[in-house]
Amino acid sequence: MEQTLPTLTDCPHCNSKLKTGGLIGTNKLVSKKFIPIINEFSGLHHEQYCEKCAQKLYETSKGKFFIERNALDKTIESIIDCVPVISLQSPHKWEYDVLDMVTGQSTTGTGVFSEFKSSFTDFFGMQSGAYNSKISNGENLCLTQLRLKCIQLGGNAVIGADIDYAEVGGDKGMLMVCMTGTAVKIHNTEVLGQERIQSLEKLTKAVERRQYLRSIDVTNNAYVTVEAS
């Protein structure tokens, strides 16, 4: 025989009386989608909150969420290059486990190949610099994708990296840059040097925390909403 859970009469956090109707307003339990972010950033561990206390807790927690997320993004961006990405298939003295293939793709804006139609002088002047800049940006984006995917797999290096270029979009002159590689986990990390080891440890923690924050539902609501009846 199933047991019926007792109906709450007071808020588990602030002990305010719960009211579903009446002449002086209501005070209902808020939707459970707000609970994870409140608990994560307030230090509280209640399963439910009421309208009276949840709004301020939610606003404060949401602010802390975005501050930490932005700080993590800056940290990851500043040290992501510490993940080695090399074309060698079996680097000398590396002892590692193969994890999985990782890939990265980037498509530039329009007008890339139109630069080839310019004069010979222009091609070897300013326009060649703009063209190379677009390619370089695409390569850097692909490298970042490979490195992030490697860390997310629990690895610390990418070997056997390969890069390809292709024209896409017909006459729109768009360039796709594609990279592939194999994510590995190096066991004898001393081959990378102490500074890189420390950066990899910091990067791994930042990526793990960033992934966890992504699992928390942060709504666009400015105000908390109640549970549906």
Task: List where the protein language model places each region.
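Short cysteine-rich clusters marking metal-coordination/redox-active sites
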Residues: 11-14, 50-53
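Short linker/helix segments within small regulatory modules
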Residues: 25-47
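Short cysteine/histidine-rich zinc-coordinating motifs and their immediately flanking basic loops
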Residues: 22-30, 61-73
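C-terminal edge-of-domain segments
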Residues: 171-211, 222-223
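Short, well-ordered alpha-helical segments
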Residues: 102-109, 115-164
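Short, non-ligating residues that shape and space the ligands of small metal-coordination modules
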Residues: 17-24, 44-45, 56-60
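Histone-fold modules and their flanking histone-like tails across chromatin and transcription assemblies
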Residues: 66-126
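Short, flexible, mixed-charge glycine/proline-rich loop motifs
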Residues: 1-8, 16, 38-45
